[in-house]
Amino acid sequence: MDTKTTPLIHAKLDEKIISSYNDANGLDIDDLWDIYNEKTRRMIHIISQRYKPKKQSPFPVIADENVRIFPPLHKTIDWAKKRNVEEQNLIEQSITESQRIFSEKQRLEQERFNRELLEKKRIEAERQRLKDEEERRKKELMEKEKKEKERIRLIEEQKHKENEQRRLKQEQIDAKRKEEEAREKRMKETFKDDPEEDSNMAWSIIHKIKTEVVAPISEKKELKNYCFTQKRKITPRLGQITKSNSQIMKITQLLQQTFQEARNTDPLVYKWVLNFFCKSVVKQAEAEVAVNPISAYPLAKVCLLLQTQNADLKDLLFARLQKNCPWVIPFWYDHGTENGKKKMGFKKLSDGHWEQNTTYNERQCGIFAVYAAILSLDDSLAPESWRTFSRLLNLPSPSQLMKSDLELGQTLCSIVSTYLDIAGQSLLRIYGRQAKKLIVCSFSEAYLGANGGGSQYGRLRIVGEDWMKGQGGLKFSFEP
């Protein structure tokens, strides 16, 4: 249909509508006009059928078959205008509805797009989360495996270290055992368990120190000065010993450092320092242990620890203890002579008289307590402990000495009481019933006598009663 020939029927298309259809559907202007004209014809036909006016004659008509009457022209024009307006409205409504539908489609499409975009983002985020979770899990697994490997490595390293420590400890035990066996064999061959020969051997060690160590050092001023410097380090440290294991280890390390410095300086200096240490132990025993016997244990432990690192110290310390206290062997000398009294451990006072027996007993018990503590703290010395105690009991008994030499009998009672207090429990623990027989013998009536003899005899009887009650021996334990 030609749009130029029907200006009243066709309205001018809105440029915005044309633009929107063109952009949305990809149609050009000619396509839109074709669509528009087709729809317009249909609507005009529908409207013309609906609003078709009834034919009325505006004025009376005389029938004549050859006459054709038309309605007035102004009515026809008005009707065409009215119909054109209605059609225009319908067209605009149709276009508006089409725009609404299109907008709704766009909105729905946008919503769908947004949903898909959100879902895509959600899926991507979930995928990333799972990826991160997997990486984290792998990292944790790797870290766990690493820690487990490290733990296993540390355990293996600790096991290796413990095995090495056990091996070294066993080697030390074996070496110590072999050394003790060799020493025991040497002692058996040398001493033949004869107290007098043991005493002579100890005195020979003292004589050797005097002639081969002390005398040469005295002639060398430089070495002598060095020895006196080391001397000032040893004495105060012995006074600092307590029952604390940590303090004992500290003092032992300081003393060993002093010994090592002396060893590095000169072999004679080393032996001189060891000899002075033994002298200091004796003085400490006379001053402190004589008053407080339980303090013998810490001092004895320091001596034992140092003996493990200084092979010459054991025999030298034994010789020094025996020189000042012959009861450690034990062996008696003829104390009726000045030389015999000196060898029995008596001290001569400045006025030329010998010390009183009470003072002598206290000093002898202090020195003997240190020796008994050494025997009790080291189980490998149990044979020596048994031999020492049995030798004491093989001496003339206190009941015999009560009539012949009461002071000597009192000293013997004090020494036996000291052994029972310090080393009795150790002997009983190692030798059991046999040790119990020996202990009971030491305070029996046959050995001690029923009564009399003074305070020393009485104390040994009280000690025996405590042992019979199962309460014998001093109660002592080291602290951390």
UniProtKB/Swiss-Prot annotation:
Keywords: Coiled coil, Cytoplasm, Membrane, mRNA transport, Nuclear pore complex, Nucleus, Protein transport, Translocation, Transport. One of its GO terms (molecular function) is phospholipid binding. Residues 128-196 are annotated as: Disordered. GO terms for biological process: poly(A)+ mRNA export from nucleus; protein transport. Functions as a component of the nuclear pore complex (NPC). NPC components, collectively referred to as nucleoporins (NUPs), can play the role of both NPC structural components and of docking or interaction partners for transiently associated nuclear transport factors. It is specifically involved in a terminal step of poly(A)+ mRNA transport through the NPC. Belongs to the GLE1 family. This is mRNA export factor gle1. It comes from Schizosaccharomyces pombe (strain 972 / ATCC 24843) (Fission yeast). The gene is gle1.
